[in-house]
Amino acid sequence: MKKLCTIITILILLSTTISISNGRESNTLQKKNLPDSFSWKNIDGADYTTEVKDQSPAPTCETYALCASLETLMQYQLQEQYEPDLSECHLYFYAGGSYHAGYVNLMDAADYLIDFGVPDEGCYPDPHRAFDYPFESLPGWENRTVKISEWGWVELETEAINSALIEYGPLVMCFSVYEDLYTYKGGVYRHETGKRVGGHVVTIVGYDDNEGCWMVKNSWGSGWGLDGYFKLAYDADLFAEWYGPGTGVMYIDGVYGNLKPDVPKVYYERPIYGHTYLFGFEFRTIFRSLPFQRAAARKFGKLYAELETYNTLKVEFYVDDVLMFTTEDAPYRWKIAASYGNHTLMVKAYNEHNASLDIVDFHVFF
């Protein structure tokens, strides 16, 4: 997508070229005189990024990073900050990922965006499970998708990355994770202590030459780092070329489709994953190593299911796929009724044309 207005005015073409290898075809990008800093969080005062999400406890970082980039491009294309919310789980599983394997092939996921696209979160909400399970998006999800026309790899050189960041939008980055990233609180990150613990995929949304770093959006929740972001040093040397030499930073381009579908939006306010409810009082779950489903909410005593809804006329509450309660009266809530053990609480919201889901697993103690 060729960026217009403000972004184009800050670029002055020079004669040298930077090579960018494309997943479906080859392409070149002219080297540019770049501004000292740039951020998709501040385009003429507008923040086109969406809220930081939390992938835990699942290994779905590839699709969280892709969707973070895509959501920003959607808002920029419409010149509207309307908080689109795409289904990372749909993209992860339908593109061939599994929790047992611990990843989805990033190139397969990008190709899936070209061939099929990704629907909104209401078609396939993230249940925050750490295991594989049967999955299926809502019927008609194909009519609610956003697609891209191409993707490619960016040369692993600072100026090439910064230029592509302006030209194409937020970039998807593969990198190695060391123990000290978990305790990051601020400043420009370079690996200093601890062993390598694995790989991760995140989204570059900006850069700052004065600090010598990229601003990176993570998917570990807004309570980590700098409200869910971190600054990565240009010279950190953490790029992971898992897909061959020269891979590690991906761009996507040519966003189109149903960017703003007429659908209800529904999200649980309580119960939510990773939290415990004791006679209505809520706190983050402790003793997480106990032999109960990881991340599932824990319920002790009376608890009401409470929702955040938009564009909604009616909701249905289900426990383990059994319809328990229907209401057309906002605010939509229901006193949870379930026996001891693990359960799945699903809500289905309707407007005049479509339906959307949200799901949370929970364990009832009493």
Predicted regions mapped to residue ranges:
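Secretory targeting signatures
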Residues: 1-25
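N-terminal compositionally biased, intrinsically disordered segments and leader/signal-like regions
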Residues: 7-10, 17-18, 146, 194, ...
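Long, low-complexity serine/threonine/glycine- and acidic-rich segments characteristic of extracellular
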Residues: 23, 264-366
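Catalytic-core signature of thiol
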Residues: 25-270
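Disulfide-stabilized cysteine-rich extracellular repeat microdomains
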Residues: 18, 209, 221, 237, ...
